[in-house]
């Protein structure tokens, strides 16, 4: 007979793979930033970094090194990379703003860690405080793509909608919700359940406005070429009645051929 713990481990392993995909989903955007030298600010990486930082705290407090810890450790390593890259390459006013945001996150994280470790003396209360913060930041992470939904509705275009992120967020939230239902954990159930709802809304909007999105024109489309063909036809002397100076003239006939 299959035990609930074995089922939970199997679901957790699959959830690991999907969570890796969630943290890797900004990679195509990051590659475009490097390729096109785009300095536009991206909010998602900062939120992912903060979310990963706070999800490390319950594992440290509970001394748990397992399925969840593997995912969050990977996210903590990967998430800040695009943000730090943009800070290094960004030379406009957004650079200073991003530096302030990251510094504020680091200070807030340090304050929470010191406050919990020094001010709270039981593991149960520490887990409760940090768990609440995890719920808040996980919810922010899942809801962050909703910031472009108003633009999608206004323009009736899904051009700037992060489809890959929405799909992976939906699968990630669905799996981790299933994971916690086998053995209930409210701190994982609430944010991931909301994540399923938020991602479903994003996918529904994508289906609705996909057909109304203007199609991009092919930049490699070849236009018709115009080839002038000149024919020189000499004409004898023109009578003085037609030319007051008595000079000779020539008529040039130009044929234009359009080749598709």
UniProtKB/Swiss-Prot annotation:
This protein's record includes keyword Protein biosynthesis: no
GO molecular function: sugar transmembrane transporter activity
Membrane topology: Multi-pass membrane protein
Topology, Cytoplasmic side: 31-40, 85-99, 149-161, 207-260
Family membership noted in the UniProt record: Belongs to the SWEET sugar transporter family.
Subunit structure, as described in the record: Forms homooligomers and/or heterooligomers.
Function: Mediates both low-affinity uptake and efflux of sugar across the plasma membrane.
Protein name: Bidirectional sugar transporter SWEET7a
Originating species: Oryza sativa subsp. japonica
């Amino acid at each position: 007979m299959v035990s609930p713990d074995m089922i939970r481990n199997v679901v957790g392993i699959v959830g690991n793979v999907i969570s890796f995909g969630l943290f890797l989903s900004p990679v195509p955007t990051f590659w475009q930033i490097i390729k096109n030298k785009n300095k536009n600010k991206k909010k998602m990486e900062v939120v992912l970094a903060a979310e990963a930082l706070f999800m490390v705290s319950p594992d440290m407090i509970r001394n748990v090194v397992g399925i969840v810890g593997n995912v969050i450790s990977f996210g903590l390593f990967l998430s800040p990379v695009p943000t730090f890259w943009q800070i290094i390459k960004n030379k406009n006013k957004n650079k200073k703003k991003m530096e302030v945001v990251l510094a504020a996150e680091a200070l807030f994280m340090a304050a929470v860690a010191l406050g919990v470790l020094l001010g709270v003396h039981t593991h149960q209360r520490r887990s409760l405080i940090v768990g609440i913060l995890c719920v808040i930041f996980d919810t922010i992470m899942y809801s962050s793509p909703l910031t472009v939904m108003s633009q999608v509705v206004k323009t009736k275009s899904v051009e700037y909608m992060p489809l890959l992120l929405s799909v992976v967020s939906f699968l990630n939230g669905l799996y981790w919700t299933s994971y916690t239902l086998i053995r209930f954990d409210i701190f994982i159930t609430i944010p991931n359940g909301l994540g399923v709802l938020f991602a479903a809304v994003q996918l529904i909007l994508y289906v609705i406005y996909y057909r109304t999105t203007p199609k991009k024109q092919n930049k490699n489309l070849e236009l018709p070429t115009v080839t002038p063909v000149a024919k020189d036809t000499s004409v004898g002397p023109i009578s003085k009645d037609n030319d007051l100076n008595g000079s000779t003239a020539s008529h040039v006939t130009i044929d234009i051929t359009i080749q598709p």
